[in-house]
Amino acid sequence: MELLLFVMSLILLTFSKAMPLFDHNSFYFEKLDDCIAAVINCTRSEVPLLLEPIYQPPVYNEDVMSILLKPPTKKKPFSRIMVTNEFLSDFLLLQDNPEQLRTLFALIGDPESRDNWLNFFNGFQTCSPSVGITTCISDNCRKYLPERITYVNNFFVDNIAGLEFNISENTDSFYSNIGFLLYLENPATGITKIIRFPFNSLTLFDTILNCLKYFHLKTGVEFDLLKQMEAYNSKLPFRSSRPTILIRNT
């Protein structure tokens, strides 16, 4: 539940390495009170107060994706494709999907199926290297040049459904402790899938930790996740002292 509430509060935010998220100069500062009220309402009521109607689907820019979906630039030697039930189900996820290219790149980046889909993708480019990528939805086709697609650091331009934290007793390595859950859906076939993208970033860990700390100080709401992250942070061998909150109040 704490993770769900945290994700709800983060939907309005864009991670930044330089600008404090809730600084007075921040675009999001004026939304802070509404965001806090919505999350507090969700903790006390069965009917949460939402800032945006839930029936409105996200609006995507087809030419802008997050860096999570950027396919590898180095091609691997083509090998056989394993046609499994999951692979066939993924084809139904792609068929006539309005977000066909975004879904394809997500499947290529999926740690569990990337080898198969990367073979498929590289094989297609080997056969037709000059046409780029062509997507077809209900006989309406469009060509893309991968090098002209814009990849941004804001992960929330994609349909992020949640975050996972794998906090273990082993603090010698920070590898793959954060995972982004990407929700894929094909309204044409009704097929859905959630893909977990591991993301190894201490900067992102600090950003989320500070967002939670600020929210706790501002509202008094307790988070088990915050306690676990602070406990984990204090055990990291390369942290000489507990960092102070990075987000300014003024």
Curated annotation (Swiss-Prot):
Got any disulfides in this one, which pairs?
Answer: 136-141
Keyword line: Disulfide bond, Fusion of virus membrane with host cell membrane, Fusion of virus membrane with host membrane, Glycoprotein, Host cell membrane, Host Golgi apparatus, Host membrane, Membrane, Signal, Viral envelope protein, Viral penetration into host cytoplasm, Virion, Virus entry into host cell
Q: What is its main location?
A: virion
What Pfam family does this protein match (any one)? Cytomega_gL
Q: Which HAMAP family match?
A: HSV_GL_betahv (MF_04036)
**PROSITE patterns on file:** GL_BHV (PS52025)
Organism of origin: Human herpesvirus 6B (strain Z29) (HHV-6 variant B)
* Any single Gene Ontology cellular-component annotation: host cell plasma membrane
Does the record bear Disulfide bond in its keywords? yes
Q: Which domain of life is it from?
A: Viruses
Recorded protein name is Envelope glycoprotein L
Could you tell me what this protein does? The heterodimer glycoprotein H-glycoprotein L is required for the fusion of viral and plasma membranes leading to virus entry into the host cell. Acts as a functional inhibitor of gH and maintains gH in an inhibited form. Upon binding to host integrins, gL dissociates from gH leading to activation of the viral fusion glycoproteins gB and gH.
Subunit structure and binding partners? Interacts with glycoprotein H (gH); this interaction is necessary for the correct processing and cell surface expression of gH. Part of a gH-gL-gO complex.
Question: What residue stretches are annotated with the gL betaherpesvirus-type domain?
Answer: 31-239
Q: Name one GO biological process term.
A: fusion of virus membrane with host plasma membrane
- Cleaved signal peptide residues: 1-18
InterPro entries, per the entry: Cytomegalo_gL
| The keyword Transmembrane helix belongs to this UniProt entry's keyword annotation | no
Q: Which family does it belong to?
A: Belongs to the herpesviridae glycoprotein L (gL) family. Betaherpesvirinae gL subfamily.
Q: What sections of the sequence does the record tag as coiled-coil? A: none
Native organism taxonomy: Viruses, Duplodnaviria, Heunggongvirae, Peploviricota, Herviviricetes
Location in the cell reads: Virion membrane; Host cell membrane; Host Golgi apparatus, Host trans-Golgi network
- Topologically, how does it sit relative to the membrane? Peripheral membrane protein
